[in-house]
Each structure stands twice: as structure tokens, then as C-alpha cells.
């Protein structure tokens, strides 16, 4: 199978690298393409963009890099459409990944899996609707989030 993974930080790189190793153990022909990091690269596959080129923290840095952020998003969407993976796996990083999920759901027939679901705080309640609409499978490491997503209750 062809797997497209997207992470945006070091912790996502760590968790995704473990997931990739587990997938490879079950699917020796696994072909990975990703926005990720060094740990994912060590497992194998093609890195499209390093997460260090994606992550901006704080209002001002995000504002200053909006053009780069949108260019990375456009590149990611185009790469997914061009490569046609069997599945897209998103790892945390909701600001970027929820937009990618929406695009993939609307423009392709590729299933979207969310590994390590986004944190659903009271002020991000709308994420529950977006996840239900755009994500085919949700895998959470915090059981609290799975029950919240199931009943539309915000996690506080």
C-alpha cells in the first residue's frame, strides 16, 4: 500500500515513525511519502518536506510566514493528488492537517485517518464537526477525546 503521512512537529515525527515501522512489519511492501522528520526518514520512504520548515509558533511568526504556510499547504495537496496514496494519515498538527483532511475528503476518494487526534478544547468545539465530516478513522491516544468526538461534547 501507499501511505501519505503528515506531521508538523518533533513529537509527531516520533509517533509517526513508530507507526510506520509497525505498518512496515505488517505490510513489507509499504511505500511511504511524507511531510515529516528525521525519525520517519530513518524508517524509509520519501520525505517531501521536513516539519521544521512547517512549524511556526506564535501570532507574529505565523503572520510573517503566511505565504510560506499557504505554499506548503498547496504543495502538500498537489503532492497527494499527484501521488494518489491508498490512505492519508494525519498526525496531530490540527491547524494544517484539518485543512488537508477537508481537501482530501472533498476532492479525492482517498481515505483519511487521523492518528493522535487534535485536542478538542471548549473553544475549538467546531473541530468535532470537521473531524466527523472529513476524517474516515480517528485514532486517539487519549480516551477522553474519543468519547467527546462521539457525542459532540467539548473537552474542557
Across the structure, where does each feature detected by a protein language model lie?
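Conserved nucleotide-sugar phosphate-binding/catalytic loop shared by glycosyltransferases and other
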Residues: 5-7, 33-79
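An aromatic- and histidine-rich active-site surface loop
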Residues: 42, 88-106
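A conserved, positively charged/aromatic
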Residues: 122-136
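A short beta-strand/loop micro-motif in the catalytic core of glycosyltransferases
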Residues: 89, 135-142
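A short, histidine- and acid-enriched strand-loop-helix "catalytic/donor-clamping" loop
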Residues: 112-126
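Conserved small/polar residues in nucleotide/adenosyl-binding loops
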Residues: 145-152
Amino acid at each position: 500500500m501507499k501511505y501519505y503521512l503528515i506531521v508538523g512537529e518533533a513529537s509527531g515525527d516520533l509517533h509517526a515513525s513508530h507507526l510506520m515501522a509497525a505498518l512496515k512489519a505488517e505490510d513489507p511492501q509499504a511505500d511511504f511519502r511524507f511531510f515529516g522528520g528525521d525519525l520517519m526518514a530513518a524508517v524509509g520512504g520519501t520525505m517531501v518536506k521536513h516539519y521544521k520548515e512547517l512549524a511556526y509558533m506564535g501570532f507574529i511568526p505565523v503572520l510573517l510566514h503566511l505565504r510560506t504556510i499557504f505554499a506548503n499547504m498547496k504543495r502538500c495537496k498537489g503532492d497527494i493528488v499527484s501521488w494518489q496514496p491508498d490512505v492519508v494519515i494525519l498526525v496531530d498538527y490540527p491547524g494544517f492537517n484539518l485543512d488537508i483532511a477537508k481537501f482530501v475528503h472533498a476532492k479525492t476518494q482517498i481515505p483519511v485517518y487521523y492518528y493522535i487526534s487534535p485536542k478538542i478544547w471548549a473553544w475549538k468545539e467546531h473541530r468535532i464537526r470537521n473531524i466527523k465530516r472529513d476524517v474516515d478513522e480517528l485514532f486517539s491516544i487519549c480516551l477522553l477525546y474519543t468519547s467527546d468526538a462521539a457525542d459532540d461534547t467539548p473537552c474542557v
